[in-house]
Curated annotation (Swiss-Prot):
Lineage of the species this protein comes from: Bacteria, Pseudomonadati, Pseudomonadota, Betaproteobacteria, Burkholderiales
Cellular component terms (Gene Ontology): cytosol
Family (UniProt): Belongs to the UPF0301 (AlgH) family.
Gene3D superfamilies according to UniProt: VC0467-like
TM spans (from-to): none
HAMAP family in UniProt: UPF0301
SUPFAM superfamilies documented for this protein: VC0467-like
Name the record gives this protein: UPF0301 protein RSc0675
Length: 190
C-alpha cells in the first residue's frame, strides 16, 4: 500500500472537471495529462473546439493542406497558456523534432514538422491540434483535486480520437461508471 504522502503521477490520465469547478476556463472540460511530476503538470483540453478548422489554421501558417478530408477537422482550445502556439496530440511515431512521449502510446508534438507531415498526408493518422495548453505548478493540481475540482481516470485514446468533442466529457465519466446526470459538485467528507 502506498504511503499517503507518496507522490502521485497522473500522466496519461484524464482530468474531468467537476460541476463545482471554480475556474470557468475549465468548466465542463476533459484534460489529457501529457506530463505530471514533482515540478507540476501539463495537459491539453480535448473537448473544446474553437471556431477555426485545420484548413484555416494551415493557411495562416503558409501550409497547404493536401488531404482534403482533414480540412474541416476542428482546432481545439488546449488551455490558457501559450494560446498562440500549436500542440499536436497524436499516436506515437517518434519521428518529430520536438515531441514529448507519453506512456500509453501517445506523443505531444510542438514542432512544425508534424504539421508539415499532416499537410502532405504523411503525418499521424490520429491526432488533435490544440492552441494553448493547461499548466499547473508543483502541487497545484493535487490541491485542486483535493478540493474536489477534478476527477481522474486512466485515459482512453479512443475517446480522444474517435468520440465527437461534445460527447467526450460524458464518455470520460463513463470510464468511472458515472452517469453525468448524477454528478454533483458537492464534496462529501466522512
Amino acid at each position: 500500500m502506498a504511503s499517503p504522502d507518496a507522490p502521485i503521477n497522473l500522466t496519461n490520465q484524464f482530468l474531468i472537471a467537476m460541476p463545482g469547478m471554480a475556474d470557468p476556463t475549465f468548466s465542463g472540460t476533459v484534460v489529457y495529462l501529457c506530463e505530471h511530476n514533482e515540478r507540476g503538470a501539463l495537459g491539453l483540453v480535448i473537448n473544446r473546439p474553437i471556431d477555426i478548422d485545420l484548413a484555416t489554421l494551415f493557411d495562416k501558417i503558409d501550409l497547404k493542406l493536401e488531404i482534403h478530408p482533414l480540412a474541416e477537422q476542428p482546432v481545439y482550445y488546449g488551455g490558457p497558456v501559450q494560446t498562440e502556439r500549436g500542440f499536436v496530440l497524436h499516436d506515437a511515431m517518434g519521428s518529430y523534432s520536438s515531441s514529448l512521449t507519453v506512456p500509453g502510446g501517445l506523443e505531444m508534438t510542438t514542432s512544425k514538422d508534424v504539421l508539415e507531415a499532416v499537410a502532405r498526408g504523411g503525418g499521424p493518422q490520429r491526432f488533435i491540434l490544440t492552441l494553448g495548453y493547461a499548466g499547473w505548478s508543483a502541487g497545484q493540481l493535487e490541491e485542486e483535486i483535493g478540493r474536489n475540482g477534478w476527477l481522474t481516470v486512466q485515459a482512453d485514446p479512443e475517446i480522444i480520437f474517435n468520440v465527437p468533442a461534445e460527447e467526450r466529457f460524458a464518455a470520460a465519466l463513463r470510464l468511472l461508471g458515472i452517469n453525468p446526470a448524477m454528478l454533483s459538485g458537492e464534496a462529501g467528507h466522512a
